[in-house]
Swiss-Prot record:
UniProt modified residues of type 4-aspartylphosphate: D56
Protein name per the record: Transcriptional regulatory protein DcuR
Gene3D superfamilies, alphabetized: 3.40.50.2300
Any one Gene Ontology molecular-function term assigned to this protein's record: DNA-binding transcription factor activity
Predominant localisation class: cytoplasm
Keyword Isomerase appears in the UniProt entry: no
Cross-referenced InterPro entries: 2C-system_Tx_regulators (IPR051271), CheY-like_superfamily (IPR011006), Sig_transdc_resp-reg_cit/mal (IPR024187), Sig_transdc_resp-reg_receiver (IPR001789)
Lineage, top ranks: Bacteria, Pseudomonadati, Pseudomonadota, Gammaproteobacteria, Enterobacterales
């Protein structure tokens, strides 16, 4: 399991992020910290190594950025993803300077959170798999694609236009309906895992918007609906 530490002084936000982490296979939240002092105590004294840190920046009287040089100087092996409402260029520049692997601006969509964690894991595994790289492999690792720029709306490997058309036709016929992965998968008769891959792609293309709801058990359920301003794009995939 990949151990994740959440650093955020807002208890509700920390709990929400903890639930997001719990929804991604292979990841577990091993602790939360509301101060940088508590965070350093966990990072440097935890029995299990902290693989990934989710770091807020605006923390009452503290600035989360102050943790980054501490980690850098200590040669800490934990990677950092910033999750913050800070969107100014100076803050982002400082974060990237200290090597954060991703930066999410609050409020963010659940699919973007999942993309950040799974994308980080994919790069980490790739780095551990090779001792040397050729240029094509390095381009794939750094840019996530070949050196030839690809159409961002091109379907990823494993997704088919036929199934996408079926899903989009159902969504088009239920424009005012907010649906879950399970509901759509049952309606079009495909597996939940496959359905989720298509939905994540549609969200990344800004065709769908996702929101999170909690049932009686407290388990988060992701629900989707059409983004009205991109309805014409959905119609293209219905053909």
């Amino acid at each position: 399991m990949i151990n994740v530490l959440i650093i955020d002084d807002d208890a509700m936000v920390a709990e929400l992020n903890r639930r997001y982490v719990a929804q991604i296979p292979g990841f577990q939240c091993c602790g939360t910290a509301s101060t940088l002092e508590k965070a350093k105590e966990i990072i440097f004294n935890s029995d299990a190594p902290i693989d990934l840190i989710l770091l807020d920046i605006y923390m009452q009287k503290e600035n989360g950025l102050d943790l980054l040089p501490v980690l850098h100087n200590a040669r800490c092996k934990s990677d950092v993803i910033v999750i913050s409402s800070a969107a100014d260029a100076a803050t982002i520049k400082d974060s990237l300077h200290y090597g954060v692997v991703d930066y999410l601006i609050k409020p963010f969509q659940a699919s973007r959170f999942e993309e950040a964690l799974t994308g980080w894991r994919q790069k980490k595994m790739a780095l551990e798999k090779h001792q040397y790289y050729d240029q094509a492999e390095l381009d794939q690792l750094i840019h996530g694609s070949s050196s030839n720029e690809q159409d961002p709306r091109r379907l990823p490997k494993g997704l088919t236009p036929q199934t996408l058309r079926t899903l989009c036709q159902w969504i088009d016929a239920h424009q005012d309906y907010e649906f879950s992965t399970d509901e759509l998968a049952n309606e079009v008769n495909i597996s939940r895992v496959s359905c989720r891959k298509y939905l994540i792609w549609l969200v990344n293309c800004h065709i769908l918007f996702t929101s999170i709801h909690y049932g009686v058990t407290g388990r988060p359920v992701y629900r989707y609906r059409i983004q009205a301003e991109h309805y014409s794009l959905l119609k293209q995939y219905c053909q």
